[in-house]
Amino acid sequence: MVKLLVRDRETIQEAVRRFRKLVERSGIKKEMRRREFYEKPSETNRRARLRAERRNKRTRMLSR
């Protein structure tokens, strides 16, 4: 959970900007997007497998 204490003489716009940065860094938005819809375990495994294949392909191409 992200907590933000508004500093002395800090405008609302500055506080909101700081809050957005904290949320982005904590990964909350990314996690919300990922959990927005249910994904079958087979789809999760498939996505992970494809990501690993791409990563391996990239490392093989770079090592040549």
Swiss-Prot record:
Top-level taxon of origin: Bacteria
Amino acid composition bias (Basic and acidic residues), ranges on this chain: 37-53
Region (Disordered): 37-64
Classification via InterPro entries: Ribosomal_bS21, Ribosomal_bS21_sf
Transmembrane segments: none
Biological processes annotated in GO: translation
One Pfam family of this chain: Ribosomal_S21
Compositionally biased intervals (Basic residues): 54-64
Gene3D superfamilies found in the cross-reference section: Ribosomal protein S8 (1.20.5.1150)
Keyword entries, A-Z: Ribonucleoprotein, Ribosomal protein
GO cellular component: ribonucleoprotein complex; ribosome
GO molecular function: structural constituent of ribosome
Family: Belongs to the bacterial ribosomal protein bS21 family.
Xref: HAMAP family: Ribosomal_bS21
Protein name as it appears in the record: Small ribosomal subunit protein bS21
Organism the protein comes from: Rhodopirellula baltica (strain DSM 10527 / NCIMB 13988 / SH1)
